[in-house]
């Protein structure tokens, strides 16, 4: 009911077209850490940036994103090792209890990233965590965005 009231306030004359409606709905969307990780695994860097900006604006604590990314990248590393051991991808996904909906995302990530690339992302994530705790000097938000964009398969400038 609140969404209808918001639309009435935004469009007092009562006329709204499909594009305006979709734009309004998009602005009202609440993004989650899981959504940004799925967007990265899917390879959608534009959506990753959009969700990231929304999470920062909503003051989502970086530690939540760090822990979720750590868990996801760690699982990808283990699956990558199993893939190198010539196990079938379907078998690996089933053994790790990957939901049917996420299987294409995980499969895509395993095709795009090597074991070494995933390991490097995990090491960078560790530095980000240390920076958050004051033991390193990285810009936490810039580095988190960088990891997510890299996870989405986009090549970034080398520092």
Annotate the PLM regions.
Residues 1-15:
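Short, charge-rich, low-complexity alpha-helical interaction segments
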Residues 11-118, 156:
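Small-residue-rich helix-loop
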Residues 3, 57-80, 117-159:
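Amphipathic alpha-helical interaction/assembly segments
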């Amino acid at each position: 009911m609140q969404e209808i009231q918001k639309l009435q306030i935004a469009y007092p004359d009562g006329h709204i077209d499909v594009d305006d409606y979709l734009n309004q709905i998009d602005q009202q969307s609440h993004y989650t850490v899981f959504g940004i990780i799925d967007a990265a695994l899917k390879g959608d860097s534009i959506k990753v940036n959009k969700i990231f900006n929304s999470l920062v604006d909503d003051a989502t604590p970086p530690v939540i994103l760090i822990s979720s990314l750590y868990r996801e990248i760690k699982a990808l590393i283990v699956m990558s090792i199993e893939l190198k051991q010539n196990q079938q991808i379907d078998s690996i996904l089933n053994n790790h209890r990957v939901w049917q909906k996420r299987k294409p995302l995980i499969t895509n990530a395993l095709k795009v990233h090597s074991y070494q690339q995933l390991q490097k992302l995990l090491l960078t994530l560790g530095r980000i965590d240390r920076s958050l705790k004051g033991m390193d000097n990285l810009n936490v938000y810039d580095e988190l965005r960088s990891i997510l964009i890299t996870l989405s398969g986009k090549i970034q400038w080398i520092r």
